[in-house]
Amino acid sequence: MEKKFRITECEIIPTEGTALSENFSLLNGSPVINYYESLKSPAISANVSFLDTDGVVSNESIMGGEMLRFTVDFAELGTFSIDENKHKLMIGGVKNVNTKSSKQTATLDAISVESFINETARVAGRYKDTSIDETVRKLIGEGAGIRAIKTDKSVFAEPTANKYSFVGNLRRPIDTIQWLCPKASSSTNHFGYLFYETYDGYNFRSIDTLLKQPPVKTFSKTEIAGADDSRILNEQFNSSNDIGMALRMGMYANNTGYFDIRTGTFGYETFTVTDLDLKRPPKLPGGLGESPSRLMFRILDVGALQDGDAVPNSNQKAQDLAKYQNKSYARNNLIFSQSLNIVVPCDPTLRAGQVITVELPLPTSDQKNKQMGDGTRDLSGDYLISELRHEIGGNRAHTQLSLVRDTFTATA
């Protein structure tokens, strides 16, 4: 049985410059709400499909810029609420407007207002010898600079082990943070960060830290119908590894060349997927994965970051940065190349970036392999929530989860 719920509030909130003169409730239009979070997205989003009985889309000229507010009361899990002052979801457009003689339906798309601010903000100046997590806090948050994104949303930036100096070059703030993610390292052996937004705020976190979290909940597959809200309603395993694209991106092997303008010297760094020390490394036939499939070139202009005539004294070599980036790219591609998609009764307490335990029954043919310690065929285990979608309305409430785990470095 699905969770008992009631949508108690679903409103369009007017803002300065919009045609709507007062709050407009969508409750009479039987709204269906979809709410999204993803480790790959720097913004939460939502859409509301409704029966436009009052013709608000056409009569009030809803074109975007309004704020979205909704509240859903769950019998057991409390209230799930999106507030225009805390979460700041702005309507970015209206789609699927379908007009018939007796009714009109429409869908409102909303996304964090910071995504729109990002399009007008630009990063200027130098960021010299600054830890990457500190740079993130300068680019977004309450303490952000005048050209960055000031927001009162929570910003959690996990400390990085390395620093990175760069010039803003008028990049957008969120684009800059995502550009810094593969350059960040939590230790000498752990590479790559993710920047994403959840219901609770912004997160800049190490991939390894996310994978090592303890599970917050357990969901099991059972054929017995009942009131168990931790059961899995549906599951599907997906493998999206594109060998051609992986070769084009240099995931298996690549070369990065450097030219130092100051010294006039040239060097290069070679990377292969074996550098990740994987217990189950991906292999290609005929030694295809051993030859570099991507060549990259960088110019090192250290003079752009020096003060006066003094030559910058950086403890981090360009080759070290290349190792961080190459290992981060490869690790991300491997982790997200396989996913387990499950559907569970709606659980608004879940967040992208949390770890859950999934328990699925083993086929009879796998029981023997399981007893022999071969865990590669067992889909049960701890998974990281990569993407999350709450679908609420139409007399049902489900949560769809896209789950990933590090199968390549997991111990058999």
Annotate each predicted stretch with a short phrase:
Residues 33-63, 224-412:
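An acidic/polar, Gly/Ser/Thr-rich interaction patch typically located in mid-to-C-terminal regions
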Residues 57, 120-129, 162-168:
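Second-shell loop/turn segments in exported
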Residues 97, 104-105, 109-116, 128-154:
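Glycine-rich, acidic and aromatic/proline-enriched surface loops and short helix-turn segments
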Residues 105-108, 112-114, 153-247:
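Short beta-strand-centered interaction patches in the first periplasmic/extracellular domains
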Residues 6-8, 44, 66, 85-90, ...:
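Envelope-exposed proteins and targeting segments
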Residues 15, 51-53, 73-75, 90-97, ...:
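Solvent-exposed coil/turn segments that connect beta secondary-structure elements
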Residues 58, 143, 181-188, 360:
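Sec/Tat-exported extracytoplasmic proteins
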Residues 1-120:
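Assembly/oligomerization scaffold segments
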